[in-house]
């Protein structure tokens, strides 16, 4: 996951992360959407979510996740921003539900 540059947006994103932390083992932030998505594709990461990146930030990673058999979707945040997220197919539904419960997507 990554965070926006606007401080008010970061505070909202931080609240989502705070809700997620007790429900996952760890959160890792590599700093590149495409590299995070490659981690999902290779199985070293269980999921990826980020609010507001541009298509050029994640497009290559999306192709790699889908080629590896994973699932990638773009949801919407409560603020109306795009929220790309991905996970292995067998885990995607549960991951997406968790993202909704934690306020990442509506």
What is each model feature region?
Residues 1-106:
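An extended, acidic
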